[in-house]
From Swiss-Prot:
Keywords: Aminoacyl-tRNA synthetase, ATP-binding, Cytoplasm, Ligase, Nucleotide-binding, Protein biosynthesis. InterPro entries: Gly-tRNA-synth_bsu, Gly-tRNA-synth_heterodimer. It is an enzyme of class 6 (ligase). Its EC number is 6.1.1.14. Its main location: cytoplasm. The lineage of its organism: Bacteria, Bacillati, Bacillota, Bacilli, Bacillales. This is Glycine--tRNA ligase beta subunit. NCBIfam families: glyS (TIGR00211). GO terms for cellular component: cytosol.
Amino acid sequence: MSKDFLLEIGLEEMPAQYVTSSVLQLEKRVTDWLTENKIEFGEIKTYSTPRRLTVLVEGMAEEQANRVEEAKGPAKKIALDDEGNWSKAALGFAKSQKVDPADLTFRDIKGVEYIYIKKEVIGEKTSTLLPNLEKVVTSMTFPVSMHWGSNDLRYIRPIKWLIAMFGEEIIPFEITGVTTSNTSRGHRFLGKSATIKQPSDYPNALLEQFVVVNAEERKQAIVEQLRELESMENWQIKEDDDLLEEVTNLVEYPTVLSGNFEKEYLELPEEVLITTMKEHQRYFPVFSQAGELLPHFVTVRNGNHENLDTVARGNEKVLRARLSDADFFYQEDLKMTIDEAVAKLQNIVFHEKLGTLTEKMKRVQKVALMLADYLDWQEEDKQDIIRLTNIYKFDLVTNIVGEFPELQGLMGEKYALLQGEKPAIATAIREHYLPNSAEGELPQTDLGSLIAIADKLETLIGFFCVNIVPTGSADPFGLRRSAFGAMRIIQANGWDIPMLEVISRIVDMERAEGSAELPGADVKKEVQTFLKNRLRVILQGHHIRHDIIDAVIGGDPNVIPQLIDRAQILNEHAEAEWFRPTIEALSRVVKIAKKYEDGVEVDPALFENEYEQALFDKLEKLKFDYAGLTIIERLKAFADLRTTIDAYFDNTLVMSDNDELKNNRLALLFELASFIKEFAQMDEINVK
C-alpha cells in the first residue's frame, strides 16, 4: 500500500534568482533521504513560489520492505579464544548487530575467514520515519542566508509555516518554533489560509487562494499574456529567458499589464532604456514590428486584473524617475571629453597591490604592442593600439556606467564615436570585455581581439605575481574566466602566439614595475600550469579523449591553435588501423631516447647497418619539411616513419656494449623524439 506525501516550507519572500535552485535542492535531498531509508516511492513533483518550496511525493510506500542484511565481523583468528569459544570481539559484534552468537558463521574472503551474519530486518512504518525529514529541511544550504529571532538556524528567509502530510496524516515536527500542520497560506493580499485535506489537493487548494504553485504554469501564463498583448497592440515583446525566469519567481499569481513613458526619452541610447527597464524594473521592453524601440513597457503584476490602470500609473511614475535620472547622467557625460575622463582614472585603484587603472592601462599597452609584434602588425595598427590603450577604460568614470555598470564598454563605444574616435577603436573599447561568459560572444575585430587578450593576460599574470590566485571555487577576480576567454579568442583567430614566451615577458614586465611578490620563475610555472588546466577544459568541450588531452598538453603547449588542432586530429584518427602501430612505434622511440646523454651528436659514419641509415635519412627529410607541413601532414609523416622505426629496432641493438655505438644510436633516437614530443607525448595515448 502507498500514500502521497506533501512537504511545504513556507517562507518570507525569497530572492527570485534562488527559488528554482532551492526547490531542486529540496527535491534531491528528499529523494536521497527516501533512498537511504529504503522507502519506495513513485514520481516526485516540485512546486515553488517566492514564498514556498514544496515537494509532493506520489505513491510512497506505507512501510519499508522487509529485507535481509549481511554484515562482516572480525577475522576468525580473533573471533575465537584458545578454547574455541567466542571471544569478546565476536560477542561484541553479535551484540552490535542484535543477533544471537549462535547465528554467527564464517566466510572465506581471499584466503582469510571472517565472521559473517545474515539477519532479517523488519521494515519500519514510514509514518514513524518521516519526522526525521526535519533534518532534511534544516540541512539545506543557500547562496545567501540569515537567522532571525533567538534561534541558531540560518536559512534563505524566515520559516513562517510548515506542512508535512502522509496521506491525511500530519507528520509532526517543529523548526524554529514553527510546527507542521495541514494549513498553507494563500496569496499575501488576495488569498486566505488553505486547508489541505490530502496531498493531491495541494495545487488546486492554493489556486483557489490565488497562488499558482507550479512555476512552469506561471511562466506559461506570462508568455500567453505577452503574446496576447503583442497581437492586440501589434507590438514585438522579445522573450528574454533570464527575465522571464526572474519574474516567474517574483509572483504567485501573474497578470501582465503595459505602461507608457515619454517619447523624448527615446533619444537616450537604446541600451540605457532597455537596461533601465529590464535590470532595474524587471520590465519587458516593447518594439515595433520593424524592431524599433517604442515608448511602452510591459510588466507582470503579482495579483489579478483589478485596478490595473492604477498599477500601471504607479509603474510609469517609477520608470519616469529612473529615465529622468538616466537622461541627466547622459547629458552630463556628454559635457566631459575623453581626455578629461582618462585623467580621472589615475584616482581609481584597480587593486591595492597592482596600482591604479592608469597604471594597468600602461601595462596592457606594452602587452598589446608585444602581441602585435608577434603577429607582424603594421605601424598604423600599432598607433591604433597606442591610442586605444590610452583611453579604453575611460567610460568607467562616466555617470551612466556608474549607474549601470553592465553598460561598461558599450557606453565607451558610443561616447568614443560621438567624440570622433576611429570606429575600429570605438568598437574595440566595447569588445575588450568579451567574452563575458564561458560560451559568450567573442570579439569580431582584430583590434578588439588583441586588446581583449592583452587585458585578460595582464590581469591574470598581474594577480599571480602578487600571489592572488583562484583557490577551490573561490575566484573573486574572475581569473579563470580571463584565462578561458583569452584562449578562446586566440583559438578563434588562429593566432600563433608563443604563449610560454609571452607569459615569461609579461611576468618580467610586472616584476620590473614592482608589482610582484614572488620569484619570477615560480610565477611563470604557476601561470603555465593554470593555463594548461584551462586548455583541458577547452579540449574537453571539443569532446577530446582524456588521454589525448594529456598527450598534447604534455607536448608543445606554446601555440594554442596548433595544440587544439593536434588534439582534434589525433582524436579523429584514433580508430584508424594505422593509428595503434604508429603510436606504439613512436612511443618506443620516446621511451628509449630518455636514456640519451647530453652532448652527443649523431655521426652517420658509426652506422653499422642500412636500417640506421634509413632512419637517419627519414629524420633529415622530416627536419627539412617539418616547418612547412600542416598538422595533419605532420601526423602522416610520423605514420610513414612507422615501418622504418620497426625495421630499425628489429635489426639494431640500441643499448650496445660498445658505448660509442650506443650513444650514437641514442642521439639519433633523441633527435627524432624531439619532433615527436613537440607534437604530443605519444606514450600518454592509450592504444591497448
